[in-house]
């Protein structure tokens, strides 16, 4: 079995040695430009166009993250980048659910207890108690009800919040109100005080966080974007905050990363920025999942995390 690995950020040595210890009979190598030697499986993140284009012999391509938008965007721009008929598999969790829960709970409670406002008051040396938010008037809406969306919804419900989710197709989540389909999006948005985006990035979801959506939220709503920067129209968010429609936003992902130093988000008092760290891939857990999927495919079984390339997730 031949496996090729490419990731522009991960430490290749850690992955190569970890995979080799789990698959001792496999030939595993780091892919470099000009490498056209045979491969059965490719483990990639943001692969160069030429890496996969001619590899019709591949049994599977593994995206080393929860999202596959980078690969599918490249396929849309350069058809044939992803060999036709080759299964595309994404990581399902690899420790991301817990990390995402931690990030979201910390951020939600910061807004719910108005810590962001007290921090601004501290800078002004202002001692002024604020009216506390009430659970029954602080409905949380989650765009996306996949593995991460469900995990976050369950955790927030444990804190006594009213939680609702919106997704492309209906989902059943205990203790959470579910909305599905484009026609139900307005009903989902109306009454939402804090909106969390956990949607997959597809052509249909790009730009979904826009002025039209913001205008339907409760006044002084909060935004948390931890999915993809392409979901957010940044100018629309700035306008909504400056108009008072959106009270504050926590953003982990951006249209351009790293965020340019002159971007207005950096200096906006109501924007909290984190450098795409809400949930990161944990190598050891990810390797276990990839290897288990390779073994399943070798045995003729369907892997966990198989992507529908038409839907985009």
UniProtKB/Swiss-Prot annotation:
The active site is at 228, 276 (proton donor). Its main location: cytoplasm. Its EC number is 1.1.1.79, 1.1.1.81. The keyword Plastid does not apply. InterPro entries: D-isomer_DH_NAD-bd, GhrA_Enterobacterales, NAD(P)-bd_dom_sf. One of its GO terms (cellular component) is cytoplasm. HAMAP family: 2_Hacid_dh_C_GhrA. Keywords: Cytoplasm, NAD, NADP, Oxidoreductase. It comes from Yersinia enterocolitica serotype O:8 / biotype 1B (strain NCTC 13174 / 8081). It catalyses: glycolate + NADP(+) = glyoxylate + NADPH + H(+); (R)-glycerate + NAD(+) = 3-hydroxypyruvate + NADH + H(+); (R)-glycerate + NADP(+) = 3-hydroxypyruvate + NADPH + H(+). SUPFAM superfamilies: NAD(P)-binding Rossmann-fold domains. This is Glyoxylate/hydroxypyruvate reductase A. Belongs to the D-isomer specific 2-hydroxyacid dehydrogenase family. GhrA subfamily. It is found in: Cytoplasm. NCBIfam families: PRK15469.1. The lineage of its organism: Bacteria, Pseudomonadati, Pseudomonadota, Gammaproteobacteria, Enterobacterales.
């Amino acid at each position: 079995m031949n496996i090729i690995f490419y990731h522009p950020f991960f430490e290749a040595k850690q992955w190569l040695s970890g995979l080799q210890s789990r698959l001792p009979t496999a030939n595993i190598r780091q892919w470099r430009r000009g490498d056209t030697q045979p491969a059965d499986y490719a483990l990639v993140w943001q692969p160069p166009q030429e890496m996969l284009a001619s590899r019709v012999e591949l049994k599977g391509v593994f995206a080393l993250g929860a999202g596959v938008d980078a690969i599918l965007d490249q396929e849309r721009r350069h058809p044939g980048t992803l060999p036709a008929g080759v299964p595309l598999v994404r990581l399902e969790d690899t420790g991301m659910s817990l990390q995402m829960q931690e990030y979201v709970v910390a951020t939600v409670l910061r807004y719910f207890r108005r810590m962001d406002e007290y921090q601004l008051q501290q800078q002004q040396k202002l001692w002024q108690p604020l009216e506390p938010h009430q659970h029954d008037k602080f409905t949380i809406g989650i765009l996306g009800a996949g593995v991460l969306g469900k995990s976050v919804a369950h955790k927030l419900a444990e804190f006594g919040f009213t939680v609702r989710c919106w997704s492309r197709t209906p989902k059943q989540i205990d203790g959470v109100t579910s909305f599905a389909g484009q026609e139900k999006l307005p009903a989902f948005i109306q009454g939402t005080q804090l909106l969390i985006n956990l949607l997959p990035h597809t052509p249909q979801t790009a730009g979904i966080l826009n002025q039209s959506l913001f205008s339907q939220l409760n006044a002084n709503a909060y935004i948390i974007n931890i999915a993809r920067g392409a979901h957010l129209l940044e100018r629309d968010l700035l306008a909504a905050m400056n108009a008072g429609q959106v009270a504050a936003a926590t953003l982990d992902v951006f249209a351009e990363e790293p965020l340019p130093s002159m971007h207005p988000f950096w200096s906006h008092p109501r924007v909290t920025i984190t450098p795409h760290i809400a949930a990161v891939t944990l190598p050891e857990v990810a390797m276990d999942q990839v290897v288990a999927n390779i073994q399943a495919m070798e045995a003729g079984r369907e892997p966990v995390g198989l992507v529908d390339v038409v839907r985009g997730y």
